[in-house]
Amino acid sequence: MEAFAVIPVLDLRHGRVVRARAGQRQSYAPIETPLAKGSEPATIARALLAACPGPTLYVADLDAIMDGRAPDLPALERIARACPGVGLWVDAGFSDAAGLEAFLDSGLGRPVIGSESQRDARLVARLGQQMVLSLDSRGSERLGPAALHADARHWPDDVIAM
């Protein structure tokens, strides 16, 4: 049987943790939670992991995903310092080798490669275990190159089904 894990998630927008609302990213507002005061990423990350301990935290950088910005490295660095020993999976809309290499060079975690951001399967095959693959879909529609969904030979060990 394959391993299955529940991984806590933070969505970042404009330097704050935001609350998801049915996928309507434009209307996400800073989170209000009984876990911690405010919406500062490192504070929320530490509180979330105290409530749901685990070895991994998924961070979606919505500014990078939606606006094409570079990942918010200062926020990721603060999260990493606040949560020692926790591996970060970072979704920043990575779609090209240069952006991925720059992120990998930062040493801040493993990039999450979303199938919806890819034009072909070569980047996934090239990165192998360095990344996490997210197989994205909308309803029954598979997003991104069909080969990413159909050919598991190039998948890393860690795959997310969205």
What are these regions (language model features)?
Residues 9-34, 98-162:
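Conserved anion-binding
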Residues 41, 72, 96, 144-145:
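Amphipathic coiled-coil/heptad-repeat helices and related helical stalk/stem segments
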Residues 36-43, 88-90, 157-162:
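Short C-terminal domain-edge/linker segments immediately following a structured domain
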Residues 2-6, 53-56, 84-88, 108-109, ...:
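Short, well-ordered coil/turn segments that N-cap beta-strands
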Residues 50-51, 55-106:
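N-terminal active-site wall of soluble small-molecule enzyme domains
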Residues 1-7, 38, 46-52, 56, ...:
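A structural preference for long, well-packed, hydrophobic secondary-structure segments
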Residues 17, 21-70:
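N-terminal beta-alpha supersecondary unit
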Residues 46, 77, 150:
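Active-site phosphate/pyrophosphate- and oxyanion-stabilizing loops and adjacent acidic/basic residues
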